[in-house]
Amino acid sequence: MTEHKFRPMTFGVTRVAIRDGAPGVHYLRAEQPLKDFPERMTDRLQHWAQVAPDRSFMARREKLATGGTGDWKHISYAQAWASARSIAQALIDRGLTQERPVVILSGNDLEHALLAMGCLVAGVPFVPTSPAYSLVSQDYDKLRHVLKTVTPGLVFAADAAQYGKAITAAVGSDIEVVLTTGHVEGR
């Protein structure tokens, strides 16, 4: 039998203090105080952009016209930080706020990640929405509900060919639409 080797891992202290509240309610508090942590989620991105600017932050395989995959497209920490800052400024320039957030229709891709980082830098909420609401649904009711609930100032989708029908059906003409590729007729 082959013995698998695993890297040793250290785990934090798991002791907790328990305080009872109302019947059936228990409050747990870790006994170990938190160590220093970044003030903002983007602080680590900024840190690594300075410490290891050329190191790969994210990557994806390029899709070929034949349906296969090509080379890897890498985004370094420095590129990601610069993109996040530029995107943040563009969001601020558009007047996006907590009342007018960004809705992301696309799945997990590099552009989605960079837009999310830009939103974090700018302090603008973003709402990653299940691609199925745009790609599987025929009535777009769930997508309409999301858009009505969060009142976006901007909707992002990676590919107009994939998301165009949903955008046309559900996104109001007063909401800016940003696409990575293609365009939606009338937008």
Annotate each PLM feature.
Residues 15-29, 44-76:
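AMP-dependent adenylate-forming
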Residues 30-39, 183-187:
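Flexible, low-complexity linker/hinge segments
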Residues 33, 57-117, 134-144, 187:
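Conserved AMP-binding/adenylate-forming core of the ANL superfamily
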Residues 106, 158, 175-187:
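Short beta-strand elements of ligand-binding domains
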Residues 120, 171:
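Anion (oxyanion) recognition and catalysis
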Residues 123:
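Structured binding elements
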Residues 128, 132-168:
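Conserved ATP-dependent adenylate/AMP-binding module captured primarily in the ANL superfamily
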